């Protein structure tokens, strides 16, 4: 089972809670997915209001662990402030740290990310950093105190699937003992299977489920795909070959001359 900051979870799917058609649809998707962890974006305008209160009550009723995030933050100071507020609201040291560096692609500001991680780990936070597949940045995040890495496979919400499989493979090889969660860009269950076959520990999804015609059914499909990819990696898959290899034995085969 995956282990994140000494916390063991059963499911390898982390599910976002934004953009669902209704709270009821969200609740059913969470249940069908079997997830242990949901991500929540803290907003000042709803945290203390009636809408925010009802949403947080729904999350509590689902009995899942909350991973607050700093989505939408474009500076270190904004991300750190949001993280501190989230700790007060949710009573957890977990934080998914996002520092956005580019408005159109929502690419992480990796320099701000490392700085923010250093500040927050110094304050006792357990940081889940949304990052790229750059190995140097990953090393800096680990040096800053992170014990989990969350590389993207494509821009947030793009549904493009893994754009740099070799980069993701290299990260897994470079950090074999670090929990790795693919975050952002997954669009189909087959995408999730692909990254799990590389040996990743988990996948974080939101748009691919929330935007589906049937979010609850899609959540269940992703769970099955993730489990299949994980099982395939553990079973030991064949490596691609350049040439054909006969799969049918030739012993006892008739020879015509």
Swiss-Prot record:
Disulfide bonds: none
Catalytic site positions: 96
GO molecular function, one term: thiazole synthase activity
Gene3D superfamilies: Aldolase class I (3.20.20.70)
Keywords from the named record: Cytoplasm, Plasmid, Schiff base, Thiamine biosynthesis, Transferase
Pathway note: Cofactor biosynthesis; thiamine diphosphate biosynthesis
InterPro entries found in the cross-reference section: Aldolase_TIM (IPR013785), Thiazole_synthase_ThiG (IPR033983), ThiG (IPR008867)
Coiled-coil boundaries: none
Role of this protein: Catalyzes the rearrangement of 1-deoxy-D-xylulose 5-phosphate (DXP) to produce the thiazole phosphate moiety of thiamine. Sulfur is provided by the thiocarboxylate moiety of the carrier protein ThiS. In vitro, sulfur can be provided by H(2)S.
Family: Belongs to the ThiG family.
Protein name per Swiss-Prot or TrEMBL: Thiazole synthase
Taxonomic lineage: Bacteria, Pseudomonadati, Pseudomonadota, Alphaproteobacteria, Hyphomicrobiales
């Amino acid at each position: 089972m995956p282990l994140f900051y000494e916390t063991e979870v059963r499911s390898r799917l982390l599910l976002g809670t934004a953009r669902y058609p209704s709270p009821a649809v969200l609740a059913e998707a969470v249940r069908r997915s079997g997830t242990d962890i949901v991500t929540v974006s803290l907003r000042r305008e709803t945290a203390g209001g009636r809408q925010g209160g009802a949403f947080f009550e729904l999350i509590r009723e689902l009995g899942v662990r909350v991973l607050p995030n700093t989505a939408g933050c474009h500076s270190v100071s904004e991300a750190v402030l949001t993280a501190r507020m989230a700790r007060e609201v949710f009573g957890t040291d977990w934080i998914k740290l996002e520092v956005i560096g580019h408005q159109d692609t929502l690419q992480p500001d990796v320099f701000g990310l490392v700085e923010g991680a250093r500040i927050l780990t110094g304050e006792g936070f357990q940081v889940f950093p949304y990052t790229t597949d750059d190995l140097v940045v990953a090393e800096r995040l680990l040096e800053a105190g992170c014990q989990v890495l969350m590389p993207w496979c494509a821009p947030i919400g793009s549904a493009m699937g893994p754009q740099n499989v070799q980069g993701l493979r290299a990260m897994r090889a470079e950090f074999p003992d670090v929990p790795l969660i693919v975050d952002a860009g997954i669009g189909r269950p087959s995408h999730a299977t692909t990254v799990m076959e590389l040996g990743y520990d988990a996948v974080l999804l939101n748009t691919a489920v929330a935007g589906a015609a049937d979010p609850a059914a899609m959540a269940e499909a992703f769970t099955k795909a993730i489990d299949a990819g994980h099982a395939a990696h553990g079973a030991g898959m064949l490596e691609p070959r350049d040439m054909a290899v006969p799969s049918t034995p030739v012993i006892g085969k008739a020879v015509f001359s």
